[in-house]
Amino acid sequence: MTNIEKIKQLAGAVDADLQEDVESVILNAGIYVAAVTTMECASLNLQNRKGEDYRSAVSRTDAARSRAHNAFIDAVNFANKLADSFGVEKIYTGGPERRDYGDFAFAIVKEIYDNRQ
């Protein structure tokens, strides 16, 4: 079963008032991947920032990336608790490392992109 199929299965199993929480996994995956892209772009320093301006840009985008990552991890962990409660397959079975969650976010976004209509 693909990641999206697992998420759809969970969305179909939960009460209507929890479906938004399940959907937030996909939305937060996209937000996190976008935040990583923004931070990496700042690190590339294509605008040739200097000194404090450069450090500030990287720091600001890194903080946004970290917040997005935390939101994604929280959404995934809550969805997995829902999966346990409703007797369906967990959407995430990867490791506890933050990078593992990040890879999962990218896999979700890639799956959405590859199967877009």
PLM segments and residue spans:
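Generic structural signal for short, solvent-exposed loop/turn connectors between secondary structure elements
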Residues: M1, D21, K50-G51
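Extreme N-terminal leader/activation tails
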Residues: M1-L18
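Intrinsic-disorder/low-complexity peptide segments enriched for small residues
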Residues: K8, A16, S24-V25, A42-L44, ...
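Short, charge/polar-rich alpha-helical segments
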Residues: V14-V33
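Acidic, low-complexity, intrinsically disordered interaction modules
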Residues: A34-D103, A107
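Short, well-structured alpha-helical interface segments that form or flank functional binding sites
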Residues: T2, S24-L27, R67-N70, D74
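Short acidic DE-rich linear segments
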Residues: N115-Q117
